[in-house]
Amino acid sequence: MSGTKLEDSPPCRNWSSAPELNETQEPFLNPTDYDDEEFLRYLWREYLHPKEYEWVLIAGYIIVFVVALVGNVLVCVAVWKNHHMRTVTNYFIVNLSLADVLVTITCLPATLVVDITETWFFGQSLCKVIPYLQTVSVSVSVLTLSCIALDRWYAICHPLMFKSTAKRARNSIVIIWIVSCIIMIPQAIVMECSTMLPGLANKTTLFTVCDERWGGEIYPKMYHICFFLVTYMAPLCLMVLAYLQIFRKLWCRQIPGTSSVVQRKWKPLQPASQPRGPGQQTKSRISAVAAEIKQIRARRKTARMLMVVLLVFAICYLPISILNVLKRVFGMFTHTEDRETVYAWFTFSHWLVYANSAANPIIYNFLSGKFREEFKAAFSCCCLGVHHRQEDRLTRGRTSTESRKSLTTQISNFDNVSKLSEQVVLTSISTLPAANGAGPLQNW
């Protein structure tokens, strides 16, 4: 749900590319004026070595990477291991997590390197692949959130018009990926590597950028306007309308498909107006009302969680979407003098895109009791697994020691028993009476 693209968005291109490098070109117009050692020191100091605030950025990216990867994998595992969690909504949530894992693994590291060094180091092939995967994951996320909103809208506002099933959800997920892979093919076609300072191409790969190359000025403007509308503005407006109606149904009105308003159901259950018939009828009515209240509360919790997911998604992708339109459509930031401010805005916007991937599992943990229980169980298993392994080693050590002691004791006892047996036998023999003048040994 974002007008974010890789080449423009965090992931895979130098947001400060050409216009911002104009200020740095002057020292390199005559590179022969500098020896190689001085030149490399300058590049290291100005472009490669992270500045103080960039160390903060690196720490932020590392935190997001770990949380996004671990959290989204746990979401997938939780739904896979528990059949009771394999609902239509959870299937879509798993698909959203898979898209987040994809963008975290493939695009986040490249984005961090580009934001710090302002250079594309990964070659022509990855210049096409990584931005393409970024836009595919964005499209998958948008379409998945749209399907979730549509599914909830039908289930709550029009339950008799369409029945959602797990099979339909799986088919929808397959269609989402196919459509996303097809409509983002132009992104891979137009991405090309180029150097901003051709005179330095033989000395360093710095100032190499991965950017779009169009045949005319009108095409990128049309493309980015359509991209913004299709992947951000239009889906966002439709989802907001859907959730507004869901909110009205769940919090302000009766859910269609139920027998009557809950408050009305309680009237015949009051002591003064209870029927004098069998008590079983009253119990069944109470059970029906309790089940309906439970259903309403469950739907409210789910709707609340999904609204928060949508809100966070919209906030995280809004800055990069606006900056992308301003840059690509209106040509802003081309000759800016305040390069540091522009760089900071783009860098922060890139980080927000990835922070959204880390935020979703946190939202599930706080707003979904089932996911929270599964996350706790997963962490408990990890902690208990380490604890059990330590206990097993200690137990094996104690068992081995006790076994040796037991074996020694048994051998010692066996020797003692043997000696005692010999004494008993000899004593018994010595006390036997002599027969016919024969001694005891003869009788034996």
UniProtKB/Swiss-Prot annotation:
The N-terminal region is required for orexin signaling. Residues 14-27 have a biased composition (Polar residues). Residues 1-30 are annotated as: Disordered. Residues 76-88, 151-170, 244-304, 367-444 are cytoplasmic. Keywords: Cell membrane, Disease variant, Disulfide bond, G-protein coupled receptor, Glycoprotein, Membrane, Receptor, Transducer, Transmembrane, Transmembrane helix. It is linked to Defects in HCRTR2 are a cause of an autosomal recessive form of narcolepsy, observed in labradors, dobermans and dachshunds. Narcolepsy is a neurological sleep disorder affecting animals and humans, characterized by excessive daytime sleepiness, sleep fragmentation, symptoms of abnormal rapid-eye-movement (REM) sleep, such as cataplexy, hypnagogic hallucinations, and sleep paralysis. Cataplexy is a sudden loss of muscle tone triggered by emotions, which is the most valuable clinical feature used to diagnose narcolepsy. Nonselective, high-affinity receptor for both orexin-A and orexin-B neuropeptides. Triggers an increase in cytoplasmic Ca(2+) levels in response to orexin-A binding. It comes from Canis lupus familiaris (Dog). Its main location: membrane. This is Orexin receptor type 2. The record marks 44 as: Important for responses to orexin. Residues 1-10 have a biased composition (Basic and acidic residues). The chain crosses the membrane at residues 55-75, 89-110, 128-150, 171-191, 223-243, 305-326, 343-366. The gene is HCRTR2.
